[in-house]
């Protein structure tokens, strides 16, 4: 099957492909909102991750029912990373759970695919902000910085622009809030069945990464998952020894697995997930999955998504959206329920050029979106408001 796919790559030049992306985006947005609503003090992260994944499977099960062969479901397992945890925290039943508490800064990250067309989204918020009160201090700084980085990217990721322009804007926005983008993190181009396409945008690269990172120009009919991670600290993410639970198959690697458990595990991975990221939680026998993954990862048949941490006491905020580069402007298909008025920072973007960029109209795109998709008028309206408020407030 994959041979044919490679010859005939389907892009958003086809209406049906756009429809599949938008259906995945709608589901991702709905699941995200329902998880944000369910997040409160005393709630377990494991239970929320399970709820998110179950909801993605349930919702994708309701569409394209007649197409029995079509694969659809989770494109990135629900991960909920709190405070200084940067990303990929998605515990197994056998791992230590985390219970949310008042004041926690929470990042929810998930992805949905319909026929291999991927819609990723991530959102940050704070637990238990009372009606009429505001989040202040470093949490507010880092959330505002990350959100404005995402808004800048929405205006910069368009045909003719370079990936380096986005990287530079992110550094400037983050620094104006005395924050730092997480070093070396990548946003990827998306293609059918491919979550890590070749064109990327790098955050806060080291000198070496700057040299090595491919410069690229955005082109019409491309799709990107734009992923912003900003820290109140130095922006260095480290593996703190937490068990990795999310992996994806690397189709370019081959190896003859020796252990029976590993072989059984790997063939289930191929059958159920193809090259999409998956969680070990999705296996009926978690213990066997934990054993089977070891040999597969050791020989690089599977790539790990390690759980990363910033220094204790710092905060990391994340916003991720998926954008289709349509001929009439970028179309954002995923976003979270961001409420700018909840976050009060003493700092703001000073750079005149950036200010102008952030205030530049995203409503033109919204209008074009409205023509494209009447069904999402409500969401366009909300994203439109956020953009206008941003323009006015910053």
UniProtKB/Swiss-Prot annotation:
Chain spans, region Disordered: 358-394
Phosphoserine PTM sites in chain numbering: 2, 335, 361
UniProt GO BP: negative regulation of apoptotic process; negative regulation of DNA-templated transcription; positive regulation of cell differentiation; regulation of translation; rRNA processing
PTM section of the record: Phosphorylated on serine and threonine residues. Phosphorylation is enhanced by HRG treatment. Basal phosphorylation is PKC-dependent and HRG-induced phosphorylation is predominantly PKC-independent. Phosphorylation at Ser-361 by PKC/PRKCD regulates its nucleolar localization.
Modified residues (N-acetylserine): 2
Region Necessary for nucleolar localization: start-end pairs: 2-48, 301-394
A matching Pfam family: Peptidase_M24
Gene Ontology CC entries for this record: cytoplasm; nucleolus; nucleus; ribonucleoprotein complex
Region (RNA-binding): 46-54
Keyword field contains Nucleus: yes
Matches recorded under InterPro entries: Creatinase/aminopeptidase-like, PA2G4, PA2G4/ARX1, Pept_M24, Pept_M24A_MAP2_BS, WH-like_DNA-bd_sf, WH_DNA-bd_sf
Regions of compositional bias (Basic residues) in chain numbering: 365-375
Domain of life of the source: Eukaryota
Positions of region (Interaction with RNA): 361-375
Modified residues (Phosphothreonine): 366, 386
One Gene Ontology molecular-function label: RNA binding
Cross-link type Glycyl lysine isopeptide (Lys-Gly) (interchain with G-Cter in SUMO2), residue numbers: 298
Keywords attached to this entry: Acetylation, Cytoplasm, Isopeptide bond, Nucleus, Phosphoprotein, Repressor, Ribonucleoprotein, RNA-binding, rRNA processing, Transcription, Transcription regulation, Translation regulation, Ubl conjugation
Family designation: Belongs to the peptidase M24 family.
Self-association state and partner proteins as the record states: Isoform 2 interacts with the cytoplasmic domain of non-phosphorylated ERBB3; the interaction requires PKC activity. Interacts with AR. Treatment with HRG leads to dissociation from ERBB3 and increases association with AR. Interacts with nucleolin/NCL. Component of a ribonucleoprotein complex containing at least PA2G4, NCL, TOP1, PABPC2, RPLP0, acetylated histone H1 (HIST1H1A or H1F1), histone H1 2/4, RPL4, RPL8, RPL15, RPL18, RPL18A, RPL21, RPL11, RPL12, RPL28, RPL27, RPLP2 and RPL24. Interacts with HDAC2. Interacts with RB1; the interaction is enhanced upon PA2G4 dephosphorylation.
Function: May play a role in a ERBB3-regulated signal transduction pathway. Seems be involved in growth regulation. Acts a corepressor of the androgen receptor (AR) and is regulated by the ERBB3 ligand neuregulin-1/heregulin (HRG). Inhibits transcription of some E2F1-regulated promoters, probably by recruiting histone acetylase (HAT) activity. Binds RNA. Associates with 28S, 18S and 5.8S mature rRNAs, several rRNA precursors and probably U3 small nucleolar RNA. May be involved in regulation of intermediate and late steps of rRNA processing. May be involved in ribosome assembly.
Name of the molecule in the record: Proliferation-associated protein 2G4
Organism in which the protein naturally occurs: Rattus norvegicus (Rat)
């Amino acid at each position: 099957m994959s041979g044919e796919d490679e010859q005939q790559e389907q892009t958003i030049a086809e209406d049906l492909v756009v429809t599949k992306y938008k259906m995945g985006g709608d589901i991702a947005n709905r699941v995200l909102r329902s998880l944000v609503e369910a997040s409160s003090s005393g709630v377990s992260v494991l239970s929320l991750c399970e709820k998110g994944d179950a909801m993605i499977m349930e919702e994708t099960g309701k569409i394209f029912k007649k197409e029995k062969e079509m694969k659809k479901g989770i494109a990135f397992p629900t991960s909920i990373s709190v405070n200084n945890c940067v990303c990929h925290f998605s515990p197994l039943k056998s791992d230590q759970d985390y219970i949310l508490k008042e004041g926690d800064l929470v990042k929810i990250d998930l992805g949905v695919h319909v026929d291999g067309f991927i819609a990723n989204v991530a959102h940050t918020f704070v637990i238990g902000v009372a009606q009429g009160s505001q989040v202040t201090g470093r949490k507010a700084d880092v959330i505002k910085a990350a959100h404005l980085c995402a808004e800048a990217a929405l205006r910069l990721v368009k045909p003719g622009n370079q990936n380096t322009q986005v990287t530079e804007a992110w550094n400037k926005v983050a620094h104006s809030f005395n924050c730092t983008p997480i070093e070396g993190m990548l946003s990827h181009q998306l293609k059918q069945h491919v979550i890590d396409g070749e064109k990327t945008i790098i955050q806060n690269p080291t000198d070496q990464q700057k040299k090595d990172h491919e410069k690229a120009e955005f082109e019409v009919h491309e799709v990107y998952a734009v992923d912003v991670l900003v820290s109140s600290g130095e922006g260095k993410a480290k593996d703190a020894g937490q068990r990795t639970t999310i992996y994806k198959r690397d189709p370019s690697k081959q190896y003859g697995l020796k252990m029976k458990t590993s072989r059984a595990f790997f063939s289930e991975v191929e059958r159920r997930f193809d090259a999409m990221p998956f969680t070990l939680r999705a296996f009926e026998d978690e213990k066997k999955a934990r054993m089977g993954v070891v040999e597969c990862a050791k020989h690089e048949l599977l790539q790990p998504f390690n759980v990363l941490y910033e220094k204790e006491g710092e905060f990391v905020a994340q916003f991720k959206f998926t954008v289709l580069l349509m001929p009439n402007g970028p179309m954002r298909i995923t976003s979270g329920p961001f409420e700018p008025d909840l976050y009060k920072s003493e700092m703001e973007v000073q750079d005149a050029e950036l200010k102008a960029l952030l205030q530049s109209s995203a409503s033109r795109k919204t209008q074009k979106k409205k023509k494209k998709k009447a069904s999402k008028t409500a969401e366009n309206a909300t994203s439109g408001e956020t953009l206008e408020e941003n323009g006015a407030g910053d």
